């Protein structure tokens, strides 16, 4: 396993313009990112070439975009796929509402085939209907491998799922990861911490990825310290480098 370490651009949401964002990413110690909607307009495919050119000039690799909330309507969702094709992006982390599960997912699969894009469902915690293994297992039984899992370790913990066991269970559909860690206050409110210092067993999780020769986007996410995220993110990067 020889993966490029990326950081979710949402971690730098305070730095909204690309000229502000790029130095922050570099200061954290990486040259790759999963781009969120703060730093690109995925609804406008015509913007993709210029955005991609700015990333190329800054020598920053886009490993994925997301998380994108898809409607299941072919025409409505198509611009996001067109954006990815124009920008040369091959991975998108996604979510969708329950009413999109049947006909909507067929449309999403059709778009993924048409634009040669790998999609990964983002499990967004205990409050999210896609946060538990049972529903994910059902969805994967009804879809092709164009739709896989973009596993968020902290939100798995929030849904009382073991992220190590979840990675093992869905290893053949694991197409991306958000490496993120939580600790909780007495009221069960989560707080982001440096990866491996909270509940996540980071060495065991990385062992699962290495044994499977995981090759998807490897993305750090730390949502704390919005106005000054670099110190914590730098520590996250250092920790992950020791385990990749």
What are these regions (language model features)?
Residues 34-52, 56:
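Glycine-rich, proline-tolerant flexible connector loops at the mouths of alpha/beta enzymes
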Residues 10, 36-38, 67-68:
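Acidic/polar N-terminal loop/beta-strand segments that form early-domain functional surfaces
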Residues 1-6, 11-31, 83-88, 132-151, ...:
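Histidine-acidic metal/acid-base catalytic patches
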Residues 40-41, 70, 99, 126-127, ...:
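Positions that flank functional sites
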Residues 21, 51, 80, 108, ...:
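Aromatic/hydrophobic pocket-lining residues that form π-stacking "cages" and hydrophobic walls in ligand
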Residues 32, 57-61, 67-149, 156-158:
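Active-site acidic/histidine proton-transfer and metal-coordination neighborhood
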């Amino acid at each position: 396993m020889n993966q490029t370490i990326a950081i979710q651009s949402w971690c730098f949401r305070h730095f909204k313009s690309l000229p502000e964002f790029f130095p922050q990413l570099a200061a954290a110690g990486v040259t790759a990112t999963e781009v969120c909607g703060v730093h690109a307009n995925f609804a406008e495919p015509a913007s993709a070439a210029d955005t991609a050119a700015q990333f190329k000039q800054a020598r920053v690799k886009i490993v994925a975009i997301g998380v994108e909330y898809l409607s299941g309507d072919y025409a409505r969702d198509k611009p996001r796929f067109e954006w990815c094709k124009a920008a040369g992006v091959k991975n998108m982390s996604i979510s969708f509402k329950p009413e999109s599960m049947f006909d909507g997912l067929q449309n999403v699969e059709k778009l993924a085939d048409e634009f040669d894009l790998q999609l990964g469902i983002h499990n967004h915690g205990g409050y999210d209907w896609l946060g538990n293994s049972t529903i994910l297992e059902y969805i994967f039984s009804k879809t092709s491998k164009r739709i896989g899992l973009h596993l968020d370790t902290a939100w798995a913990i929030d849904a009382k799922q073991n992220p190590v066991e979840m990675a093992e269970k869905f290893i053949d559909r694991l197409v991306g990861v958000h490496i993120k860690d939580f600790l909780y206050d007495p009221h069960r409110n989560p707080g982001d911490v440096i990866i491996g210092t909270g509940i996540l067993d980071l060495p065991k999780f990385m062992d699962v990825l290495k044994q499977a020769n995981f090759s998807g986007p490897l993305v750090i996410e730390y949502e704390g310290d919005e106005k000054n995220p670099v110190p914590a993110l730098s520590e996250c990067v250092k920790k992950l480098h020791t385990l990749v």
